[in-house]
Amino acid sequence: MMAIFGAKNPHPQSLTVGGVTCVMDLMDPARMGEYMSKFAEIKEFVDRAYYPDILMAAKAYANEPSVLNDVGVSNLFCYDEFLIGKNDHLFKGGIILNGDISKVYDIDENKITEEATRSWYKNDKALHPYDGETEANYTGLVDGESIDGEGKLAHSKLFDTKGKYSWIKAPRYDGMPMQVGPIASIVINYAKGNERVKKIVDEFLTKSGLPLSAVFSTLGRTAARMLEAKVVAEHTMDAFNALIENLKTDQETCTKYAIDNKKEYKGNFQGNAPRGALSHWCRIKDGVISNWQAVVPSTWNASPKDAKGQMGSYEACLVGLKIADLSKPLEIIRKIHSYDPCIACAVHVMDTKGNDLSTYKINPNL
């Protein structure tokens, strides 16, 4: 659907290489009709398939301990998302601490840091993204025993959980781990009294018979993703109509800028991606980018421990989990899948016996 107005997709819609959004396409009745037709198909799927399926699952697993007994990290973080009117977002941003929905805090970007105490990077200090460093420092695996494919203990190479063990950094807000994603958007907006969200959430809770506290679970994360889709499906046309109204008075497709090579600049983007809170932080010096750091949703959720020993949400939700068959730990997969992981940039193929698979030399100047 994005490609209808923005040329190639998936590609950045703001760069010439990937295609530039064309105002005339937005004003073309045929293009608008195509968009609305495809949107109607998506809304029908959400209403008639996605919602009923999750409702059925909620009822079926309402008393399943491995589904419900999972808090993980109960600090929630989301940004404003989907502008549907002047200063009016479909989802409002904010922060909830310790699962307490009686208070939603405003976001202070100065409190965001990343550290690498347990990550394979050199500088362990908690740094603001503007000052972030990403210089690799792979320290290897350690000898030990682990469960093999038959569910038995066997000699293996293991992650050094007392040292560095991940390619993912540890983002923190005011020194605390956060959980991001649809669960954060839904709970924070419910707590803020966002009627667009409250109406749909209350209806689902009534039909499923679940309490609001059930959202802090594997089932809750899965349901929150559906509820977010439901809210978006109900109000997409509000955003679309607001865009059309805006085009009647403003047809600019870009903001011109000029870089003075004698000055230094810094700027950021903070917003929500489908998997949660996303931010990019850039410094410019001597007319070129001197530092660029991205703090992405799965980094928040999949982060390793920090210097205080605090776990990220993936790790925290697995503590105490009972595994029925050690050779097939489906319970672990179920929980992690509920976060919808996107960690391609942090996944490295490793041999559990410690053998090098291949070696690559990278020229950073190319």
Language-model-derived ranges and their functions:
Residues M1-R275, V296-L366:
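Active-site bordering "gate/hinge" segments
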Residues L278-V296:
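Short beta-strand elements
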